[in-house]
Amino acid sequence: MDPQGALVQVSPACERLSGYSQDEFLADPKLMERIVHPDDRPRFEQHIAHSHAAGRLLEGEIDFRIIARDGGEHWIAHTCAAMIDPSGSYLGRAACNMDVSRYKLAEEALLRLNRELVATRDCASATLRATDEQKLLRDTCRIVCNAAGYLMAWVGIVERDECKTVRPVAWSGVEDGYLSSANITWADSERGRGPTGTAARTGETVVLDDYASDPEGQPWRARAFQRGYRSSIAIPLRGPAGDAYAVLTIYADRAHAFARSTTRLLEELAEDLSLGIESLRAGSKLDSA
């Protein structure tokens, strides 16, 4: 960039990353600004403004996302520094933009895994202290949302009635009336083939990766989108005989949120919860005997 902030040279590598050519960047001084992710644009603009104002005094670093021509999202590590000629005159600024998307994704995955480990630990602690089943279910849902960062969690009892109802008994997070209108069943019907109904019917964990495209989520798609749900996982709570008597269902605000490592941790959490419920019920029977 020259001292006024206009681009004078751009690396050919910019096209491989952004989809826009050298000529396009040089012809449109605002192109770089426009392709910065909207959530990161204020920070980027502030950085550029400070860089120009400070001139030779500022060396800067900032991470931000860009939206490429094809719609792909990339994390950029940006560094810039002043260029000074031998006489001490300020010539402008040189900047380097490096694609660090893989590192950012790995960092985010590690942070999520750590949150889930904390949630698993906190749920285990709540289970050990529990004296009331309903409170344990509520506490588990709350911890899953608050500690692990999920959008909503609920537990539904698998009723053995004619309609094969899954009855919500505890929840936390962004629910906003979703459960009262979901009409989830574990029958082999349209409203029983989503994650919760299938987990109740089969006794196996079920993941719905993307409410936007997975056909199993179609009956709830509009209501899910209104609340920000993009993917979900349903984990059966199994009794001693192995049959599902309840289901823990969790919703995330992004698609494909439930990787294998995440699923394993959440299954451990559900298993601990199930053992806690069995222990409380066994104690209740002894008290009433």
Predicted segment positions?
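Short loop/turn elements at sensory-signaling interfaces that couple input to output
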Residues: 2-4, 77-95, 162, 241-244, ...
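PAS/PAS-like sensory domain cap-loop motif
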Residues: 4, 14-26, 177-180
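GAF sensory/regulatory domain recognition
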Residues: 8, 74, 142-145, 154-187, ...
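PAS-associated C-terminal cap
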Residues: 39, 85-89, 95-115, 119, ...
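Regulatory sensory and allosteric helical modules in signal-transduction proteins
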Residues: 42-46, 166-169, 176-215, 219
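PAS/PAC sensory module
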Residues: 61-65, 70-79, 84, 94, ...
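Sensory-domain boundary capping and coupling elements
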Residues: 78-80, 95-97, 196, 237-252, ...
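A short, aliphatic-rich beta-strand micro-motif
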Residues: 192, 230-239
